[in-house]
Amino acid sequence: MLNTTSVTEFLLLGVTDIQELQPFLFVVFLTIYFISVTGNGAVLMIVISDPRLHSLMYFFLGNLSYLDICYSTVTLPKMLQNFLSTHKAISFLGCISQLHFFHSLGSTESMLFAVMAFDLSVAICKPLRYTVIMNPQLCTQMAITIWVIGFFHALLHSVMTSRLNFCGSNRIHHFLCDIKPLLKLACGNTELNQWLLSTVTGTIAMGPFFLTLLSYFYIITYLFFKTRSCSMLCKALSTCASHFMVVILFYAPVLFTYIHPALESFMDQDRIVAIMYTVVTPVLNPLIYTLRNKEVKGALGRVIRRL
């Protein structure tokens, strides 16, 4: 991985420039990180250890929990360190590594939401054929595919970014190493990087988002025209609504961040909006997708009683 940079480290400006807020924000984000890791860790442990949850639906939920633990850990520990530090530096290699894992896990989660929406649509609309359509082989192949695509998507960006020439300011207008603020610091031609960011990352975000919307539209259409039970309709719509809320909270900020041009006027908005999909969504996922589920709560109760 070659680069012609004269910069050996970057300075992360953080969430806010107001020094008086740093201790308070440290406590807030530390609490969020603890809840995220604990909640997702509990879900992952239950899905692995309880034989009653060894089904395809919980296979995807286990993937989501593992993703969210990793996703939070890529950004939050460094953010917490910087809240209490006066020198908010990150090495060049550390910056590129954070960029790679951030985009690898983020794009994988984006595609996983689409897979989970499709899984839910099959479970609701074709329950008798669910085990035939969503067979273990297909689910394993889908999971491996999205992880591999996410890895190579991030590898493309990390390699291309590492080869840029950084000869001026090393102050990143963000709380993490992301592509857009790094491109603002590059001295050379970044047109190819900008095109890859808009085209490839835009496709990775827009494609799964469209497929997710399509799955939920199909579910709602099916429920209104095929379901005669009001209780079943209300329960299914409640499940879809809560899932869809998490999906919107993830996709909307991502699309806002990576679709609009990299202008100086958007930098402050970008780092605030990024909190939604880097910090908030990983906390909500275990609450919305699993801990509201009766089978998961039952499994959690059995684990607690055994302790």
UniProtKB/Swiss-Prot annotation:
Q: InterPro entries, per this entry?
A: GPCR_Rhodpsn, GPCR_Rhodpsn_7TM, Olfact_rcpt, Olfactory_GPCR
Extracellular side: which ranges?
A: 1-23, 74-97, 159-195, 258-270
Keywords, in A-Z order: Cell membrane, Disulfide bond, G-protein coupled receptor, Glycoprotein, Membrane, Olfaction, Receptor, Sensory transduction, Transducer, Transmembrane, Transmembrane helix
Give GO cellular component annotations, separated by semicolons: membrane; plasma membrane
What residue range is the signal peptide?
A: none
User: Sugar-bearing residues?
Assistant: 3
Q: Which protein family is named in the record?
A: Belongs to the G-protein coupled receptor 1 family.
Where does this protein come from, organism-wise? Homo sapiens (Human)
| Gene Ontology process terms (BP) | detection of chemical stimulus involved in sensory perception of smell
Q: List the disulfide bonds.
A: 95-187
What is this protein's function? Odorant receptor.
The record's subcellular locations are: Cell membrane
| Pfam families noted in UniProt | 7tm_4
Tell me the protein's name: Olfactory receptor 12D2
Give residue spans on the Cytoplasmic membrane side: 45-52, 119-137, 216-236, 292-307
